[in-house]
Design a protein with these regions (language model features):
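Helix-to-loop junction immediately C-terminal to a conserved catalytic motif
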Residues: 49
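Conserved catalytic motifs of ABC-family nucleotide-binding domains
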Residues: 155
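Conserved ABC transporter NBD signature motif
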Residues: 57-65, 77
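Catalytic Walker B motif of ABC-type/P-loop ATPase nucleotide-binding domains
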Residues: 159-162
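Conserved ABC ATPase signature
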Residues: 134-138, 142
Length: 226
């Protein structure tokens, strides 16, 4: 599904953010990427999202090099990926329902589809009773649930969650991880980055450990090093 082949990234100041990273991520996998700040986790995600180009190596999705495709095809590729961030990135003047609906509108979905799908995904993340609340009326965990609902509402193949529990207390972080696991169980590939080893312990699936821009361990048994 997603293959990184000897991917390296060197910036203008000669900093090596990635150094020869090779990974194969299969459909329906749940993959956690762990490492301290500066390990290369965020740069790796930017490669997958085609926000940055590698200095060396290739990133392919379904055997297509994503850094060599046309702009129209790039838009289609990005529609197949949902993103969740540490800082939620919700629209402050829109309710939870409207934030999720906005993602569907941007994708050209119909009003009928929006009315059917938005309540469904908000129920899926256990936020059905607060769909008409504004972000300032929600807790941090609830805001992240809205962000997850927004990420999955257009039925992407992959969810990329970049430090999704970074601003949350341990109990709420566990709840968010359980929601991501539920989404994965429904067939969506999930790629999660974190520096919180406790989060990884709760998941118990494949873990990729990074250090100094390199993969130092890749375990299907939930084992990791930092």
């Amino acid at each position: 599904m997603l293959f990184l082949d000897k991917v390296s990234k060197r910036y203008a100041d000669n900093t090596d953010a990635l150094n020869g990273v090779s990974l194969l991520i299969k459909p329906k996998e749940f993959v956690s990427i762990v490492g301290h700040s500066g390990a290369g986790k965020t740069t790796l995600l930017k490669m997958i999202l085609a926000e940055e180009k590698p200095t060396e190596g290739d990133v392919t999705f379904e055997n297509i090099n994503i850094h060599k495709i046309r702009k129209s095809d790039m838009n289609e590729y990005r529609r197949r990926i949902g993103t969740v961030f540490q800082d939620f990135r919700l629209l402050a003047d829109k309710t939870a329902y409207e934030n999720v609906a906005f993602a569907m509108e941007a994708a050209g979905r119909t009003e009928e589809e929006i009315h059917a799908d938005v309540p469904h995904v908000l129920e899926l993340v256990d936020l059905g009773t607060k769909m008409h609340n504004f972000p300032h009326q929600l807790s941090g965990g609830e805001k992240q649930r809205v962000a997850i609902a927004r990420a999955i509402v257009n039925q992407p193949d992959i969810i990329i969650a970049d430090e999704p529990t970074g601003n949350l207390d341990p109990k709420t972080a566990y709840e968010i991880v359980q929601i991501l696991k539920k989404i994965n169980d429904l067939g969506t590939t999930v790629i999660l980055t974190t520096h919180n080893t406790g989060v990884v312990d709760h998941i118990g699936k494949r873990v990729i450990s990074m250090r100094d821009g390199m993969v130092v361990m890749d375990s299907d048994k939930g084992e990791f090093v930092v």
